[in-house]
């Protein structure tokens, strides 16, 4: 007999009847929260957009505020974004937003003169522009148009063209190509101003010899058009990257100067990973070998006499991993001290935990600043006397984030947790945003209670004001039956598996509930976090009576290198095993109906859910894979090779072949499988699901599939509503049908 559980309606003390969440609530974003990130423009001033869409400048010390850009000015060009020049004389207004890939987009830009209240005429900007930004000082601006970089000394001046070789899908100047945007830089730009705006550094990516992925975009025309993207897959030829620097004061007199690549990196294929200006005369570049277990940090100085950038070998700092790849998901970036020589950086200590180190002359002589069986996550700011960072050290929960201040002006350095005891029940997961010189900062709390954003004095840490506390959301949720959440851990064979379990509102341990595993599981990811969310799985628990579980297994982040690097060169093994192990432990808890267990995931999670379903354990009745990777030979070089090595006979080809979903097609025979993908997925190509479908058909295995035409990896717009409605029906059918 199959019992489908529904949470009962309860009576609260105020006399009103609470209701369960509905799918419509989720699809409409009824219970979404707000955060407040100040747009800092000085040590004590920030900009923000009001409810009326006016751009307000607020001075913390005087308490004064005024409109710097009116909503009528914004509306006159249908602007959706803005940027104030550092001298406060001009603002750019951004309109005609057109999304490209994850971070990149094109837009139209209008320059508004704040002194006379008029738009700048003459030498207007071309359209559409791929990227635009002000210099850090004054009102110079640089922009990228048709893959070339242009400089304006003033908004009304004619542009100076810095590069001439830009070409669509071939040469990218000042913006990354697809693979660098997605897998290395995680930005839409690849140019960086020096602190005072004297120099401009930029990257050039040459994709001329890169294989192209081509897919159809159906649109509304009689014939589909073909989208072509240079996309290096595992083992394929990579883009060639070069870094140039130009003096923007007299760009026509001295052209761009190339920055040399360290010899130990340049001897074979390599990556550029990031660039940090130390001051106007010193720059720091980070490079990676293609195998990504060796990173070189190179500090270069400008030689005025020769007009070159000198990068001595003595200023090369090497970071190497012998058990995995260098860094976490990315190699960490340095934060330089005021002496413009020494810096702070996060990397693994001798015990295999990622901690803050102070480097003055070499990495070998680095001084470890933090230590323990936890990890430093991010260095926010270094001032003359303080270092602010985030970590998960407090009370031993890896899925929490607190902000700490270390006094570096005294010896021994003293440490203070700024956030550990602020609204402790409500707030256990923070990030921060600092003004110049850390004079003030905003704390943004993401949960587990309702998110709240607050403003603080950078000298005393005292709270000055609440910026956003989500009062409207709090009132709206008073009449809603939210599920309960628990974060706990399983200890299995010396492996710690942290999990979050979401329980129906009227949960009763003496009853049996269907279980849905939501998995991502990719290297360096973390799903079990102390954050607030009202989402699809909240609805499934609140209304449909399901228990939902998220498990962080081997390969996930912020618990030390032993767990993180366990999956190195063998993706698709331990991530799957740990989900299966957790399910068996959940069954032992006594309240899971072992005949009604499902698993679902998106992207890497779709890969893991597919392999779990095809594991032959008999644990799962059904499952869903959205936009899954099906073979690592089909995915991007930078990501795949970081974790798997190369698909060659003399390296790791055997595991590439053994880790495919297609190799397990026969094992889907005894599960209900729903396969979902967008046909215009630029990230995990539709090819992945097409190959799964072909293998299942060849094995004569029945399955369900849903394709979303012209949709990318995110399945947005109306497709989102259809997707979650369809998956809900699939799970309800799975859990209601008898064997």
Across the structure, where does each feature detected by a protein language model lie?
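Beta-propeller folds
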Residues: 1-440, 446-451, 528-529
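Serine-hydrolase catalytic core recognition
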Residues: 211-212, 272-274, 288, 417-739
């Amino acid at each position: 007999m199959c019992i489908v559980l529904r949470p009962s309606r309860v009576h609260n003390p105020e006399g009103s009847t609470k209701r369960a969440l509905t799918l419509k609530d989720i699809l409409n974003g009824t219970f979404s929260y707000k955060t407040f990130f100040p747009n800092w423009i000085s040590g004590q001033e920030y900009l923000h957009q009001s409810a009326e869409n006016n751009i307000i400048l607020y001075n913390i010390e005087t308490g004064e505020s005024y409109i710097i850009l009116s909503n009528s000015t914004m509306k006159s060009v249908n602007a959706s974004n803005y940027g104030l020049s550092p001298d406060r004389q001009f603002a750019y207004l951004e309109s005609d937003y057109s999304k490209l890939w994850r971070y990149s987009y094109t837009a139209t830009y209008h320059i508004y003169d704040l002194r006379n209240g008029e738009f700048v005429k003459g030498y207007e900007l071309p359209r559409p522009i791929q990227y635009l930004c002000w210099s850090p000082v004054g009102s110079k601006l640089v922009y990228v148009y048709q893959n070339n970089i242009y400089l304006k000394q003033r908004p009304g001046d004619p542009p100076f063209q810095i590069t001439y070789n830009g070409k669509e899908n071939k040469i990218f100047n000042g913006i990354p190509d697809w693979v660098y945007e997605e897998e290395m830089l995680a930005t839409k730009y690849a140019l960086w101003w020096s602190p005072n705006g004297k120099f401009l550094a930029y990257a050039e990516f040459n994709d001329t010899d890169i294989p192209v992925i081509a897919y159809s975009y159906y649109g509304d025309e009689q014939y589909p058009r073909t989208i072509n993207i240079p996309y290096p897959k595992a083992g394929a030829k990579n883009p060639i990257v070069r870094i140039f620097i130009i003096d923007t004061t007299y760009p026509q007199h001295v052209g761009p100067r190339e920055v040399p690549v360290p010899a130990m990196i340049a001897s074979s294929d390599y990556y550029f990973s990031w660039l940090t200006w130390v001051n106007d005369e010193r720059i720091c570049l980070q490079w990676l070998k293609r195998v990504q277990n060796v990173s070189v940090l190179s500090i270069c100085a400008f030689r005025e006499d020769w007009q070159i950038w000198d990068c001595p070998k003595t200023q090369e700092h090497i970071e190497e991993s012998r058990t995995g790849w260098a860094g976490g998901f990315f190699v960490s970036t340095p934060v330089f001290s005021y002496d413009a020589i020494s810096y702070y950086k996060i990397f693994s200590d001798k015990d295999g935990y990622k901690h803050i180190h102070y480097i003055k002359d070499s990495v070998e002589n680095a001084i470890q600043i933090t230590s323990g069986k936890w990890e430093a996550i991010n260095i926010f700011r270094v001032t003359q006397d303080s270092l602010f960072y985030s970590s998960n050290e407090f009370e031993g929960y890896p899925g929490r984030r607190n902000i700490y201040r270390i006094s570096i002006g005294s010896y021994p350095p003293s440490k203070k947790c700024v956030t550990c005891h602020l609204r402790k029940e409500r707030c256990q997961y923070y990030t921060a945003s600092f003004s110049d010189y850390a004079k003030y900062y905003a704390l943004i709390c993401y949960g587990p209670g309702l998110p709240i954003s607050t403003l603080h004095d950078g000298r005393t840490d005292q709270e000055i004001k609440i910026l956003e506390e989500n009062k409207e959301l709090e009132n709206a949720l008073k009449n809603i039956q939210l599920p309960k959440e628990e974060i706990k851990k399983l200890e299995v064979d010396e492996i710690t598996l942290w999990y979050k379990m979401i329980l129906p509102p009227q949960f009763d341990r003496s009853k049996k509930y269907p279980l849905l595993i939501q998995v991502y599981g990719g290297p360096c990811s973390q799903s079990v976090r102390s954050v607030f969310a009202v989402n699809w799985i909240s609805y499934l628990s609140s209304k449909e009576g399901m228990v939902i579980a998220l498990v962080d297994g081997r390969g996930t982040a912020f618990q030390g290198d032993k767990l993180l690097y366990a999956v190195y060169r063998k993706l698709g093994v331990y991530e799957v095993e740990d989900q299966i192990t957790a399910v068996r432990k959940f069954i032992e808890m006594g309240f899971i109906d072992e005949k009604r267990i499902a698993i679902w995931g998106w992207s890497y999670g779709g890969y893991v859910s597919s392999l779990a379903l095809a594991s032959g354990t008999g644990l799962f009745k059904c499952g869903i894979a959205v936009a899954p990777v099906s073979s690592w030979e089909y995915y991007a070089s930078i990501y795949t090779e970081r974790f798997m090595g190369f698909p060659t006979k003399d390296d790791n080809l055997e595991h590439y072949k053994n880790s495919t979903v297609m190799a397990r097609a026969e094992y889907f025979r005894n599960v209900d499988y729903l396969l979902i993908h967008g046909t215009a997925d630029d990230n995990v190509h539709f090819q992945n699901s097409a190959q799964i479908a072909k293998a299942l058909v060849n094995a004569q295995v029945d399955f369900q599939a849903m394709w979303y035409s012209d949709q990318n990896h995110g399945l947005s717009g109306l497709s989102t509503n259809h997707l979650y409605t369809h998956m809900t029906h699939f799970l309800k059918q799975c859990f209601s049908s008898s064997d």
